[in-house]
Regions:
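Conserved H-loop
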Residues: 29
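Catalytic core of pol beta-like nucleotidyltransferases
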Residues: 1-23, 32-37, 48-104
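Short hydrophobic/aromatic beta-strand micro-patches
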Residues: 44-46
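Short, conserved active-site loops that position catalytic residues or coordinate cofactors/metal ions
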Residues: 39-41
Length: 104
């Protein structure tokens, strides 16, 4: 299990490497308080605007180097979040419903 100090550090790193106004949300098993022995961390990073979400995800994932855990970093623009937040079954809906904000 990954301790809260490490999770908070990851949130700070992701927020610090992102544009102003970015929100970092932890979701998945750690946010629900149900991590298993092999659980990774799942982050939704909501940026004001995103040109290429895949490239930004890779760039942000690199900021977590040195923290010894597996992580998924999903990047979405504020507009994409608005478009998908009410669509049940979507990743964005689930992340917002179960997640907790680490950094804003």
């Amino acid at each position: 299990m990954i301790d809260e100090a490490t999770i908070d550090e990851a949130g700070r790193r992701l927020a610090g490497a992102s544009p102003p106004g970015t929100r970092v949300i932890l979701f998945g098993s750690h946010a629900r308080g149900e991590p298993g022995k092999h659980s990774d961390l799942d982050f939704l990073v909501i940026e004001p605007e995103v040109e290429n979400a895949a490239e930004e995800s890779v760039r942000l994932r690199r900021t977590l180097r040195g923290l010894l855990f597996a992580a998924d970093v999903i990047v979405a623009s504020e507009q994409r979040v608005r478009d998908w937040r009410d669509v049940k079954g979507s990743l964005i809906h689930a992340a917002l419903a179960e997640g907790r904000e680490l950094a804003a």
